[in-house]
């Protein structure tokens, strides 16, 4: 509708301009005939009247020029609004494709006891105890001690090699993070044909889930497939500080991952020379802090903001078109007034 009204207005303007040209030519012929009939005595009146009409014509032209400039300015604003609409839609689609990672922290009083799966091989478990804050000095290193931890033995097939049978020692991890609970384990390896000695271990989220699982071998196969494994070497005390990361996937599933910081301290072996042939392993497991890190992908594109911006852009386009239509009508009105005054002046002169 706006385009039809604009085309009609411009057609009326062109017709009025043709009429102005014809009227101006007829007025010039009348002026010439009047000059011929009345002679040179009427020239001063004609000069003054033509001067005033030229001033009015120049003012009308100036107004028309300003109107045309305003129309061009609003056309430019319309182009900017169209570009903003296009850019807004493209940004919204880009944000939908690339969500932003959000990280938050949840404080807990205690953790669900994790499971610590150890693969000692030929190494023997000498002692396992739960302590709080401080580990007392070793009394008889290398000798069997108390095993006050909850442990389970599981044999299962390696998920990456069906021909390998693995034996895992599952230990219940610490819970009381506020009291700085820790688990201290000691192993002894009498003889080894390997050039380097180390014990593998992996961490999984819940020891209770392992106990309640009807298929513990399958449970450990799934854990080994999902979690990474680490090592601690003999002749050192390895201190492992654990932290928990919960990641929410795009399909809504939640995955749990352990992150750890390790510090290694050299063990000063003061045993008799006859006992030093057996290598000792020391490892400590403790929670780093009472904060669970939660990671999820969020979409920053807000559809309501996009809709509001699009509505504003379309409103600007509508207002610009309406102003252009009113400007054309105003120019036609000014032209009609000028033609009316020009006709009255011509009649007065004649």
Curated annotation (Swiss-Prot):
Compartmental location: Cell membrane
Chain segments annotated as transmembrane: 65-85, 302-318
Alphabetically ordered keywords of this record: Cell membrane, Chloride, Chloride channel, Glycoprotein, Ion channel, Ion transport, Membrane, Phosphoprotein, Transmembrane, Transmembrane helix, Transport
Domain of life: Eukaryota
A Gene Ontology BP annotation from the UniProt entry: chloride transport
Phosphotyrosine: residues bearing it: 10
UniProt name for this protein: Proton-activated chloride channel
Organism: Bos taurus (Bovine)
Organism placement in taxonomy: Eukaryota, Metazoa, Chordata, Craniata, Vertebrata
Recorded name of the encoding gene: PACC1
């Amino acid at each position: 509708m706006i385009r039809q009204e604009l085309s009609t207005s411009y057609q009326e303007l062109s017709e009025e301009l043709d009429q102005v040209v014809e009227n101006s030519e007829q007025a010039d012929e009348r002026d010439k005939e009047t000059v011929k009939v009345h002679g040179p005595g009427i020239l001063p009146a004609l000069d003054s009247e033509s001067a005033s009409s030229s001033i009015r014509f120049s003012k009308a032209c100036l107004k028309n020029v300003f109107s045309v400039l305003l129309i061009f300015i609003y056309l430019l604003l319309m182009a900017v609004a169209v570009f903003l609409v296009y850019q807004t839609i493209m940004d919204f689609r880009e944000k939908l494709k690339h969500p932003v990672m959000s990280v938050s922290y949840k404080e807990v009083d205690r953790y669900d006891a994790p499971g610590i799966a150890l693969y000692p091989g030929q190494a023997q478990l000498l002692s396992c105890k739960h302590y709080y804050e401080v580990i007392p000095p070793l009394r008889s290193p290398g000798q069997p001690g108390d095993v006050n931890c909850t442990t389970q033995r599981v044999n299962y097939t390696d998920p990456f090699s069906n021909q390998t049978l693995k034996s895992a020692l599952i230990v219940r991890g610490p819970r009381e993070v506020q009291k700085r609970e820790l688990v201290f384990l000691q192993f002894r390896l009498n003889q080894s044909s390997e050039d380097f000695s180390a014990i593998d271990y992996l961490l999984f989220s819940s020891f209770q889930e392992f106990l309640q699982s009807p298929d513990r071998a399958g449970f450990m196969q799934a854990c080994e497939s999902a979690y990474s494994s680490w090592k601690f070497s003999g002749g050192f005390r390895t201190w492992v500080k654990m932290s928990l990361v919960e990641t929410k996937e795009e399909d809504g599933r939640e995955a749990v991952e352990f992150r750890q910081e390790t510090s290694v301290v050299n063990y000063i072996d003061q045993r008799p020379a006859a006992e030093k042939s057996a290598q000792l392993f020391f490892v400590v497991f403790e929670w780093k802090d009472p904060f669970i890190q939660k990671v999820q992908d969020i979409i920053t594109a807000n559809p309501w903001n996009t809709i509001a911006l699009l509505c504003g852009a379309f409103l600007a386009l509508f207002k610009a078109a309406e102003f252009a239509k009113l400007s054309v009508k105003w120019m036609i009105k000014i032209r009609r007034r000028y033609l009316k005054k020009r006709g009255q002046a011509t009649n007065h002169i004649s």
